[in-house]
Amino acid sequence: MNRKLSREKAMELLFGMTLNTDNCEETLGNFIDNYESDIKELDITYIKRILIGVENNKDNIDEAISKNLCNWKIDRISKVNLCILRLAVYELLHDEEIPNRVAINEALEITKKYSDEKSVSFINGVLDNILKK
């Protein structure tokens, strides 16, 4: 099982959940039914934990993000970057299995793939601020 790929898929599913009204169970079910590569490559338990964790702690996660934005409001953050932040903040605040530096580094790697260089610095700054508190 590939944790890096699983984290990336979790972010993609979180992004999809921001665009429609499906809950995490429906989203994950649809994903598993339609995944075209070898599903054994993914840690489905981890993906489910991320989706449920973000969904159940969204208000707390968004509050942590909002408190650590400098001259920004959370509704100005692109949906992709917000999903990356939510995943990473969930791991920082609610998932003791993931070391903090791993959560931040993986978030930055996902940002490099799905966003732009300015976003990498922005997300790094927000996550570092959260980690310091």
Swiss-Prot record:
One of its GO terms (molecular function) is RNA binding. Involved in transcription antitermination. Required for transcription of ribosomal RNA (rRNA) genes. Binds specifically to the boxA antiterminator sequence of the ribosomal RNA (rrn) operons. It comes from Clostridium botulinum (strain Alaska E43 / Type E3). InterPro entries: NusB-like_sf (IPR035926), NusB_fam (IPR011605), NusB_RsmB_TIM44 (IPR006027). Keywords: RNA-binding, Transcription, Transcription antitermination, Transcription regulation. The keyword RNA-binding applies. This is Transcription antitermination protein NusB. Pfam families: NusB (PF01029).
